[in-house]
């Protein structure tokens, strides 16, 4: 089986810095991750409607700022609630709420970024391919 496709919606302020540092530090993680930089993870619901699981990603994670570090003040808290709701919806649809997760990190958390990628890859392998994949 090919590596599962993981979409990572990463905050420009924090998650992107962690992903960039992971790359420049030559940290190892599956190449099947698709990082999508967003201005703030608080806008995640919009991106989820047009990308991610509906488009066939096997798993999705959101990498947002740590609590009280969001440049937009509450973006990371609002997305945390949206991720919880999305998990419930995916469970009700029979797709699996474990296909989505929220991770908090700073721009210096390269290790946290690679752990998130690896965790979501392992989850996607256990869950199998996204049933919405064409």
UniProtKB/Swiss-Prot annotation:
GO molecular function: 2 iron, 2 sulfur cluster binding; metal ion binding; oxidoreductase activity
Reported cofactor(s): [2Fe-2S] cluster
Cofactor binding mode and count: Binds 1 [2Fe-2S] cluster.
Keyword annotations from UniProtKB, A to Z: 2Fe-2S, Electron transport, Iron, Iron-sulfur, Metal-binding, Oxidoreductase, Transport
Any Pfam family the entry gives: FlpD
Claim: Metal-binding is one of the keywords in the record: yes
EC number: 1.12.99.-
Family, similarity comment: Belongs to the MvhD/VhuD family.
Self-association state and partner proteins as the record states: The F420-non-reducing hydrogenase vhu is composed of four subunits; VhuA, VhuD, VhuG and VhuU.
Annotated protein name in UniProt: F420-non-reducing hydrogenase vhu iron-sulfur subunit D
Species the sequence originates in: Methanococcus voltae
């Amino acid at each position: 089986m090919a590596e599962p496709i993981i979409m990572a919606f990463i905050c420009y302020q924090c998650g992107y810095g962690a992903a960039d540092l992971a790359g420049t530090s030559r940290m190892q993680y599956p190449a099947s991750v698709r990082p999508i930089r967003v201005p703030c993870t608080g806008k995640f619901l919009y991106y989820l409607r047009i990308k991610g699981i509906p488009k066939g990603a096997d798993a999705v994670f959101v990498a947002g700022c740590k609590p009280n570090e969001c440049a937009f003040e509450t973006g990371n808290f609002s997305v945390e609630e949206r991720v919880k709701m999305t998990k419930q919806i995916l469970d009700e649809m029979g797709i699996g709420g474990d296909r989505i997760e929220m991770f908090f990190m700073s721009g210096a958390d390269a290790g946290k970024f690679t752990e998130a990628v690896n965790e979501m890859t392992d989850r996607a392998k256990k869950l199998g391919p996204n049933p919405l994949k064409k």
